[in-house]
Design a protein with these regions (language model features):
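Domain-level detector for secreted/extracellular nuclease and nuclease-toxin modules, and
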Residues: 16-161
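Bacterial Sec-dependent N-terminal signal peptides
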Residues: 1-21
Length: 161
């Protein structure tokens, strides 16, 4: 299964490699339409569309550069609520004894280029429940691949959701 997932990802990435940012109609591709009910939060290192009904992100998007990958701020932090976000959000207690990992949507390892970005990576608005085997296995492998590509190609754009 791991090989199939990796090959599928590689095919998708290679198919898009070298294509312009124009869509089929010839118009430039744009950000998805954001409505008044969307909760888009712009952090220093990533942007998240947070779903106040499911209490997990709809998506997270960010640019990762080769310089950022080499950041020196150590992983540290404790998951907590984003007190500046006034909408309903998950709490640490939601994950207590649940059997689920608190899985970063934008990984802390991609945000080690500043103390602030590292801190923001631990907001509960940046996590979703993940099976431990997935979180520490294939998902981790995919996160590392994104960092490898950022080093190889100078920057990558990552969207998760």
């Amino acid at each position: 299964m791991r090989i199939i997932s990796t090959l599928l990802l590689l095919v998708v990435c290679l198919t898009g490699y070298g294509q312009t940012s124009k869509g089929i109609s010839g118009s430039l591709l744009e950000m998805p339409k954001i409505t008044a009910s969307d909760n888009v939060i712009i952090y220093t290192g990533f942007t998240v569309s947070y779903n106040t009904k499911t209490l997990i992100p709809n998506w997270v998007a960010y640019e990762l550069t080769n310089v950022e990958v080499d950041g020196q701020f150590p992983r540290k932090g404790q998951f907590g609520m984003d007190l500046s976000f006034k909408g309903r959000q998950a709490m640490r207690e939601d994950y207590s004894n649940s059997g689920w990992d608190k899985g970063h949507m934008c990984p802390a390892a991609d945000l080690k280029w500043s103390e602030k970005t590292m801190y923001e990576s631990f907001y509960l608005t940046n996590i979703c429940p993940q099976n431990h085997e997935l979180n520490s296995g294939d998902w981790l492998t995919l996160e590392k691949l994104g960092r490898e590509w950022a080093k190889k190609f100078d920057k990558v754009y990552i969207i998760c959701g």
